[in-house]
């Protein structure tokens, strides 16, 4: 309750100082006197930084920055400007959620994390990039913020579940929450990407097994290797639960460079998250659909690299789902799973929330790809992951708070402009002439 008022300007906190001048837009705003130097508290800071659009980076830019003369000072100057902008943009949208959702303890907790992280970042806006102690403290702050936000996804999911249990869901609220969560989680993925890159490059704790990685990015990500890893781990879970599991049939075609291993510049953990989730779904459907037969058809995976796209198609024979249910699989508000407890980051991520598919789709869309489902009811389902083959085209997809976004939350959703068929058969006898 207090946090909602805080973001809306109902309560003031300690004054925060001038804005960073790392970009022309922020610098000019500060120089013209329109910056937040004279404003008090979090609301003024959020309003100021939300006026600026986030700066999307391409995979190539991430790669070039980390591999060619990686400079901690440059990263410091960019992140102290960019992170507040990304945080503020999504914080403005959080404040537009229904009041009853904002009052849930879980959403309050998420808001407190974002406020604290924003304030910690703004402590560096006037500090010199030439001061070694400042650079060290900033990296330490970045790692602390990253760890603080570990449980953002399940905690926000818990808040939505709390709201749903207490107040139910109407179509308008469901549509707005779906719109918000897609943008909120995409923002979270992007913020974590920046935090991870800085902490892995300059935090001194890079994994020895990932020496060729540039932060969290593998310049030569072996797609088939990641797919096999996801399959084996999903298979272990399937064997534990069903005491059996379907085999994997994998085929790869490198149409771009025939005969060579399929490799792309990508974040292996993102690809792993997607294929692991799809394997779990495919295995469960296959085991349950063929339970009475005792013979389980294999899961087929085709990997193709073309000039523009890397495509991964996973096909199962798990019985499929009706067309009308496909959209529900990506709906955050639809999950019928029992509410799990959010305890620590060591818990199985998103277990029980039904968020696996929508979050996986966001990972695919983050660098301009996509994830789509095509189902043949009674037979099985094809899941297709699209990834940009060129690192120059793999550019972050970032939400921006603007008038169009504001209107989406505030617009009155009118009646459908298409006829809605009746659930009951029409009694045609009423139209008979006497």
Curated annotation (Swiss-Prot):
Reactions catalysed: L-seryl-[pyruvate dehydrogenase E1 alpha subunit] + ATP = O-phospho-L-seryl-[pyruvate dehydrogenase E1 alpha subunit] + ADP + H(+)
According to its UniProt entry, what is the function of this protein? Kinase that plays a key role in regulation of glucose and fatty acid metabolism and homeostasis via phosphorylation of the pyruvate dehydrogenase subunits PDHA1 and PDHA2. This inhibits pyruvate dehydrogenase activity, and thereby regulates metabolite flux through the tricarboxylic acid cycle, down-regulates aerobic respiration and inhibits the formation of acetyl-coenzyme A from pyruvate. Plays an important role in cellular responses to hypoxia and is important for cell proliferation under hypoxia.
EC no. given is 2.7.11.2
An example of a Pfam family matching this protein is HATPase_c
Tell me where it mainly resides. mitochondrion
Q: Which gene encodes it?
A: Pdk1
Regarding protein family, the annotation reads: Belongs to the PDK/BCKDK protein kinase family.
Q: Which residues participate in ATP binding?
A: 277-284, 316, 335-336, 352-357
Protein name per the record: [Pyruvate dehydrogenase (acetyl-transferring)] kinase isozyme 1, mitochondrial
Listed under subunit, the entry gives: Homodimer, and heterodimer with PDK2. Interacts with the pyruvate dehydrogenase complex subunit DLAT, and is part of the multimeric pyruvate dehydrogenase complex that contains multiple copies of pyruvate dehydrogenase (E1), dihydrolipoamide acetyltransferase (DLAT, E2) and lipoamide dehydrogenase (DLD, E3). Interacts with phosphoglycerate kinase PGK1; the interaction is direct, occurs under hypoxic conditions and leads to PDK1-mediated inhibition of pyruvate dehydrogenase complex activity.
Question: What are the Phosphothreonine sites (modified residues) in this protein?
Answer: 336
């Amino acid at each position: 309750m207090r946090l909602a008022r805080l973001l809306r300007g109902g309560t003031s906190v300690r004054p925060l100082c001038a804005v960073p001048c790392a970009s022309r837009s922020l610098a000019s705003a500060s120089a013209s006197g329109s910056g937040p130097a004279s404003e008090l508290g979090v609301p003024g800071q959020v309003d100021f930084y939300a006026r600026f659009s986030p700066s999307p980076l391409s995979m190539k830019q991430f790669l070039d920055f980390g591999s060619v003369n990686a400079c901690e000072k440059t990263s410091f100057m960019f992140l102290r400007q960019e992170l507040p902008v990304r945080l503020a943009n999504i914080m403005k949208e959080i404040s537009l959620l229904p009041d009853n959702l904002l009052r849930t303890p879980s959403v309050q907790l998420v808001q407190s994390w974002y406020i604290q992280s924003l304030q910690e970042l703004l402590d560096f806006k006037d500090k010199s990039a030439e001061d070694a102690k400042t650079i060290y403290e900033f990296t330490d702050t970045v790692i602390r913020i990253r760890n603080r936000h570990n449980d953002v996804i399940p905690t926000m999911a818990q808040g939505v579940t709390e709201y749903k249990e207490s107040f139910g869901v109407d179509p308008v609220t469901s549509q707005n929450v779906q719109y918000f969560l897609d943008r909120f989680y995409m923002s979270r993925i992007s913020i974590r990407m920046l935090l991870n890159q800085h902490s892995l490059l300059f935090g001194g704790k890079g994994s020895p097994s990932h020496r060729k990685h540039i932060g969290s990015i593998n310049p030569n990500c072996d797609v088939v290797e990641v797919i096999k890893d996801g399959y084996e781990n999903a298979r272990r879970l399937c064997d534990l639960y069903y005491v059996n599991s379907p085999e994997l049939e994998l085929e790869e075609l490198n149409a771009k460079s025939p005969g060579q291993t399929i490799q792309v510049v990508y974040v292996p953990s993102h690809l792993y998250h997607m294929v692991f989730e799809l394997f779990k779904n495919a295995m469960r459907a296959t085991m349950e659909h063929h339970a009475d037969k005792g013979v389980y058809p294999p899961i087929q995976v085709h990997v193709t690299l073309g000039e523009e796209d890397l495509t991964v198609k996973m096909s199962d024979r798990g019985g499929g789902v009706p067309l009308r249910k496909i959209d529900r699989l990506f709906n955050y508000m639809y999950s019928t799973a029992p509410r799990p407890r959010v305890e620590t980051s060591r818990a199985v991520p998103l277990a029980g929330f039904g968020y696996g598919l929508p979050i996986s789709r966001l990972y695919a869309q983050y660098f301009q790809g996509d994830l789509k489902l095509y189902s043949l009811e009674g037979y099985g389902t094809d899941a297709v992951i699209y990834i940009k083959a060129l690192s120059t085209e793999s550019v972050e997809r970032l939400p921006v708070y603007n008038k169009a976004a504001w209107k989406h939350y505030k617009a009155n959703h009118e009646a459908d402009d298409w006829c809605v068929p009746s659930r009951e058969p029409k009694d045609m006898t009423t139209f008979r002439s006497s």
